[in-house]
Amino acid sequence: MLDLRKIITKTFNEVLKQTNPEHKIYDKLDDDLVLLDSGLDSLGFAILVALLDEELGYDPFQIMEEPIYPSTFDEFLKIYEIHKK
């Protein structure tokens, strides 16, 4: 069984290292972490979603019928859980 939280956290930190190396790396992403304050910008999130698509085999933002823009890590994680293949 996939541990989405673990996979997303690992990938999130990889992207953060590439796009914002001065920002701290997260041991754990808290559910209430505001994505705008996370250290990733819009390009970073695009890279994150693309890498997760490669690793998980799906992009929930392409699958969903109505666009949803998560504001917290919990909302981001839930989007992946709801659309999990």
Where would I find each of the regions flagged by the language model?
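Phosphopantetheine-dependent thiolation modules in NRPS/PKS and related acyl-activating systems
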Residues: M1-G39, G44-I47, E54, Y58-K85
